[in-house]
Curated annotation (Swiss-Prot):
<dbReference type="GO" id="GO:0016597">
    <property type="term" value="F:amino acid binding"/>
</dbReference>
<keyword id="KW-0808">Transferase</keyword>
<dbReference type="GO" id="GO:0006526">
    <property type="term" value="P:L-arginine biosynthetic process"/>
</dbReference>
<dbReference type="GO" id="GO:0019240">
    <property type="term" value="P:citrulline biosynthetic process"/>
</dbReference>
<comment type="similarity">
    <text>Belongs to the aspartate/ornithine carbamoyltransferase superfamily. OTCase family.</text>
</comment>
<dbReference type="GO" id="GO:0004585">
    <property type="term" value="F:ornithine carbamoyltransferase activity"/>
</dbReference>
<keyword id="KW-0028">Amino-acid biosynthesis</keyword>
<dbReference type="InterPro" id="IPR006132">
    <property type="entry name" value="Asp/Orn_carbamoyltranf_P-bd"/>
</dbReference>
<dbReference type="InterPro" id="IPR036901">
    <property type="entry name" value="Asp/Orn_carbamoylTrfase_sf"/>
</dbReference>
<dbReference type="Pfam" id="PF00185">
    <property type="entry name" value="OTCace"/>
</dbReference>
<feature type="binding site">
    <location>
        <position position="289"/>
    </location>
    <ligand>
        <name>carbamoyl phosphate</name>
    </ligand>
</feature>
<keyword id="KW-0963">Cytoplasm</keyword>
<comment type="pathway">
    <text>Amino-acid biosynthesis; L-arginine biosynthesis; L-arginine from L-ornithine and carbamoyl phosphate: step 1/3.</text>
</comment>
<feature type="binding site">
    <location>
        <begin position="226"/>
        <end position="227"/>
    </location>
    <ligand>
        <name>L-ornithine</name>
    </ligand>
</feature>
<feature type="binding site">
    <location>
        <position position="80"/>
    </location>
    <ligand>
        <name>carbamoyl phosphate</name>
    </ligand>
</feature>
<feature type="binding site">
    <location>
        <begin position="53"/>
        <end position="56"/>
    </location>
    <ligand>
        <name>carbamoyl phosphate</name>
    </ligand>
</feature>
<dbReference type="InterPro" id="IPR006130">
    <property type="entry name" value="Asp/Orn_carbamoylTrfase"/>
</dbReference>
Length: 303
């Protein structure tokens, strides 16, 4: 069997993504019922972190342990990834020691080079370009609360960042409508828009957050300046009209969900009233990172 990498939603088939989501639901239910299975007994996951992390580190570590495997954490400063040793050599060496590699990095190119040279599965834990694991958790969370996402409308307001890039890919893979409102100069990368449209994504772009959110089934945002992207920082006055507050949520459907990958800058991209309110499912999202990633791990390792 060829090596199964999980680099982006665009690189995995719709059928495999749906298989993983269904598997995540089953694994979550079994855990809640007290069932314990260890399909990854004896397997080791190397976790490489160029960027600090809470959810990614803990969810992959706990997830691997719940599946019976083990983890080893490596930081960019410890490894000097791509500096004292080439990424290609690192990939080849780690492939001799471990069964899979997860990387959270500021550089998507590092992920791709690692994938090209590793002989074990490589998982994208987050890059400056995409965040596919987050979208797996988001779709799982939406469907837990509202049923199949196909045909529904999801709205994004804020910065055109890595989460939005994966959301664009998800819109094509999972067949939902995506409305996007970003300020001028903060647009998502054109390559992700083009890929989504070429694969059936139904996209609508606007400068108006109210227009984007109108009758949406779910409203999604993220921090205005992503970690490691401070050089892209723009004045809050540029983004302030895109804040998700009660007034903006009123334009969505009455039962609309609110999502945020966390950590949230309360009072900036979202108000306390919304993130702590009845629309919010942000902590369900965070929990589902664990279960969605367990399904990704099992798929990558053929378990």
């Amino acid at each position: 069997m060829s090596v199964r990498h999980f680099t982006d939603l665009s690189t995995v088939s719709e059928g495999d993504l749906r298989f993983m989501l269904d598997d995540a639901v089953v694994r979550k239910a079994r855990l809640k019922a007290g069932e314990r299975t260890r399909p990854l007994e004896g397997k080791v996951l190397a976790m490489i972190f160029d960027k600090p992390s809470t959810r990614t580190r803990v969810s992959f570590d706990v997830g691997m342990r719940q599946l019976g495997g083990e983890t080893i954490m490596l930081t960019g400063t410890e490894m000097q990834l791509g500096r004292s040793e080439t990424i290609a050599d690192t990939a080849k060496v780690l492939s001799r020691y471990v069964d899979a590699i997860m990387i959270r990095t500021t550089s998507h190119d590092r992920l791709l080079e690692l994938t090209e040279n590793a002989t074990v599965p490589v998982i994208n834990g987050l890059t400056d370009d995409t965040h596919p694991c987050q979208l797996m958790a988001d779709i799982m969370t939406f469907e837990e609360h509202r049923g199949p996402v196909a045909g529904k409308t999801i709205a994004w307001t804020g910065d055109g960042n890595n989460v939005l890039h994966s959301l664009l890919e998800a819109s094509a893979r999972f067949r939902f409508n995506l409305n996007v409102a970003v300020p001028e100069g903060s647009e998502p990368a054109q390559k992700h828009i083009d890929w989504s449209k070429a694969h059936g994504g139904k996209l609508h772009f606007t400068r108006s957050p109210e227009e984007a959110v109108d009758q949406a089934d779910c409203v999604v945002t993220d921090c205005w300046v992503s970690m490691g992207q401070e050089h892209r920082a723009r004045g809050h006055n540029v983004f302030s009209p895109y804040q998700v507050n009660a007034k903006l949520m009123a334009h969505a459907k009455p039962d609309a969900l609110f999502m945020h990958c966390l950590p949230a800058h309360r009072g900036e991209e979202v108000t306390d009233e919304v993130i702590d309110g009845p629309h919010s499912v942000v902590f369900d999202e965070a929990e589902n990172r664990l279960h969605a990633q367990k399904a990704v791990l099992a798929w990558c390792l053929g378990a």
